[in-house]
């Protein structure tokens, strides 16, 4: 029997949970079950390091009421007249120092994609019944676009997994919104 900490035990437990119980005996007749999507969600990253890409990303991120809890009447001029005119250039230069040039993307996108690919590989025994994908709360690929893609791929249920280490309204709650 596999150790409770072994990879095969972990994936078997996960698959059991999806099925609603323990695995069936080998001689049991097949049971049709629908596809399940697992969507890993991380915070986000701009599409590029140029001024307009950074501005678009910062506007989406800093317009979220869960992230900035200042009254809109006060926040709108600060965001649009100060932050979005001065910060995109500076933040773009900062991002440029850590940008993944090989894939032309931010490091968080690279890491999140890799996590989804590794999870899909580890859970491959589920066959095409389990579909793993990933999204960004701010930026691309968006949660909405990936939920739509999972639905098009025939997923009857979708489990959304925020990749944050703890609960906070500005992170986990905004994914659920």
Where are these regions (language model features)?
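Active-site-proximal alpha-helix that buttresses catalytic centers in soluble enzyme cores
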Residues: 2-177
């Amino acid at each position: 029997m596999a150790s409770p900490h072994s990879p095969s035990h972990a994936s078997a437990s996960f698959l059991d949970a999806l099925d609603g119980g323990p695995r069936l005996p080998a001689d049991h007749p097949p049971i049709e079950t629908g596809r399940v999507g697992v969507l890993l969600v991380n915070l986000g990253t701009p599409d590029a390091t140029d001024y307009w890409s950074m501005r678009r990303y910062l506007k989406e991120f800093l317009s979220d009421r869960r992230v900035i809890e200042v009254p809109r009447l006060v926040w709108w001029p600060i965001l649009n007249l100060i932050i979005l005119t001065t910060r995109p250039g500076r933040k773009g230069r900062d991002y440029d120092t850590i940008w993944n040039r090989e894939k032309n993307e931010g490091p968080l996108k690279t890491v999140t994609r890799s996590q989804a690919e590794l999870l899909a590989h580890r859970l491959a025994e589920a066959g095409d019944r389990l579909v793993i994908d990933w999204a960004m709360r701010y930026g691309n690929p968006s949660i909405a676009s990936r939920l739509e893609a999972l639905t098009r791929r025939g997923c009857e249920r979708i489990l959304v997994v925020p990749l944050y280490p703890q609960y906070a309204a500005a992170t986990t709650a905004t994914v659920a919104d």
